[in-house]
């Protein structure tokens, strides 16, 4: 199984198709699509990154990072519908973020989304202080990781 990836913008049709799948999945898990946490029109190509993963020319995973503060990016809208694609995607997003000068990645997910929580822990993300709109929101859990150069 050999994955390929493409750096795209959030309006790319394959990204949009995968995000529709993500929204359905999140609604089933959390009763919320999470759409309000990411506005694709706010995507700034000089600071942000968006990747779609492919297997045999079929889009199987996607994710975004966006500027949070100096040297810190926030991972958003991570989704995979193929075993193994999520790990490869995360690595590519981290490498892309490093290319853009980021040294740390942060993210938030719902505590009830145990699959996501386990995934991030398995990839060396540690629980961290809540940030931004997640401060005081008990249903959310925030993670961070120092990006290795």
Model-predicted regions and their roles:
Residues 86, 90, 113-116, 133-139:
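Short glycine/proline-centered loop/turn elements that form peptide/ligand docking sites
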């Amino acid at each position: 199984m050999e994955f390929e990836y493409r750096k795209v913008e959030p309006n790319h049709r394959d990204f949009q198709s995968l995000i529709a799948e993500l929204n359905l999945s999140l609604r089933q898990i959390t009763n919320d699509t999470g759409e309000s946490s990411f506005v694709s029109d706010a995507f700034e190509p000089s600071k942000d990154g968006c990747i779609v993963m492919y297997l045999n020319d079929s889009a199987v995973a996607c994710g975004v990072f966006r500027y949070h503060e100096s040297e810190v990016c926030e991972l958003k809208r991570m989704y995979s519908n193929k075993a193994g694609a999520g790990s490869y995607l995360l690595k590519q997003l981290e490498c892309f973020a490093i290319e853009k000068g980021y040294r740390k990645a942060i993210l938030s997910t719902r505590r009830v989304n145990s699959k996501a929580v386990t995934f991030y822990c398995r990839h060396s993300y540690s629980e961290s202080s809540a940030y931004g709109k997640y401060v005081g929101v008990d249903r959310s859990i925030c993670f961070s990781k120092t990006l290795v150069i």
